[in-house]
Amino acid sequence: MNNLKWVAYFLKSRMNWIFWILFLNLLMLGISLIDYDFPIDSLFYIVSLNLSLTMIFLILTYFKEVKLYKHFDKDKEIEEIKHKDLAETPFQRHTVDYLYRQISAHKEKVVEQQLQLNMHEQTITEFVHDIKTPVTAMKLLIDQEKNQERKQALLYEWSRINSMLDTQLYITRLESQRKDMYFDYVSLKRMVIDEIQLTRHISQVKGIGFDVDFKVDDYVYTDTKWCRMIIRQILSNALKYSENFNIEIGTELNDQHVSLYIKDYGRGISKKDMPRIFERGFTSTANRNETTSSGMGLYLVNSVKDQLGIHLQVTSTVGKGTTVRLIFPLQNEIVERMSEVTNLSF
């Protein structure tokens, strides 16, 4: 904020003083006009001296009182303002003390709530890890099932449980995702194939195959774990809303950027739903009776893609299917973005 604005604010806040002083001086001038015995020259001298002293007083008061608010305008911490004793007047000191008490109390609440959130996150993480043990044991038991039809049905349900546990684990780690990322060149094809293998029990039951076509060098600079999570959620949606149609997966190269597309021929997304597909908990308005969707998959994808520098495009036609395209960044773009984030944090 420039000095002229500060002067305007100060004068506006002292306008009652200024009007009162002007009123008193005009009153004296008025009295002198009525009382002819009162020397007019002496009165003009007194009024001029009074106004001059008032002007000096206002200037000194301005520099004394505005100093604190200039520190506020620079976003100084209240602790620094209190520690350096930047408040000049008793009212300013009272205001600073009040703000300090309130902000300190709020900070204590935030710290307490953060500790509770951390404990909650740790509890859920431990729960997911603990429950993974019997789920893994369940898989070994299912593999021993002789009846192939029953085995396939059990593997389908097991895959859904395992996928939901992984999704819950990623949700709890969202807040700490930046600390949990490690960027390196990884094979996009390898990640896609690994995720297809994890979903094979679901795809087999639903009669869905995969047409994979990698035409370009598929090594991308990303974090393996979080990138696989994005691919998994998109594949999960494609499988969930498709039936007896193959899912097409491939890569393209545009402006040196590798892009991965996943195309299904399912029911598609309506135009009115499209702006809301990334909202937490949002499910299709066209199928309100559906209970298998949690509305968390694309929310997770949207929450992570920016940290990975991935540009996401979704196109869909109702009754014809959906295409999701992931455009991966170059290494220098990731390094530049991370440098900007680091500078902002300081």
Swiss-Prot record:
Record has ATP-binding as a keyword: yes
GO terms, biological process: cellular response to phosphate starvation; response to antibiotic
Compartment annotation: Cell membrane
Catalytic activity entry: ATP + protein L-histidine = ADP + protein N-phospho-L-histidine
Entry function: Member of the two-component regulatory system GraR/GraS involved in resistance against cationic antimicrobial peptides (CAMPs). Functions as a sensor protein kinase which phosphorylates GraR through the auxiliary protein GraX. In turn, GraR up-regulates many genes such as adhesins, exoproteins, transporters, toxins, and proteins involved in cell wall synthesis. Down-regulates the expression of many genes involved in RNA and amino acid synthesis or glycolysis.
Assembly and interaction partners: Interacts with GraX.
Ranges where the Histidine kinase domain occurs: 126-332
Lipid bilayer topology: Multi-pass membrane protein
EC number: 2.7.13.3
PANTHER family referenced in this protein's UniProt entry, alphabetically: HISTIDINE KINASE (PTHR45453:SF2), PHOSPHATE REGULON SENSOR PROTEIN PHOR (PTHR45453)
Top-tier EC class: transferase
Transmembrane segments: 15-35, 43-63
SUPFAM superfamilies linked to this entry: ATPase domain of HSP90 chaperone/DNA topoisomerase II/histidine kinase, Homodimeric domain of signal transducing histidine kinase
Pfam families associated with the record: HATPase_c
Protein name: Sensor protein kinase GraS
GO function term, MF aspect, one: ATP binding
UniProt keyword list: Antibiotic resistance, ATP-binding, Cell membrane, Kinase, Membrane, Nucleotide-binding, Transferase, Transmembrane, Transmembrane helix, Two-component regulatory system, Virulence
GO cellular component: a single term: plasma membrane
Stretches of the chain forming a coiled coil according to its record: none
Keyword Nucleotide-binding found: yes
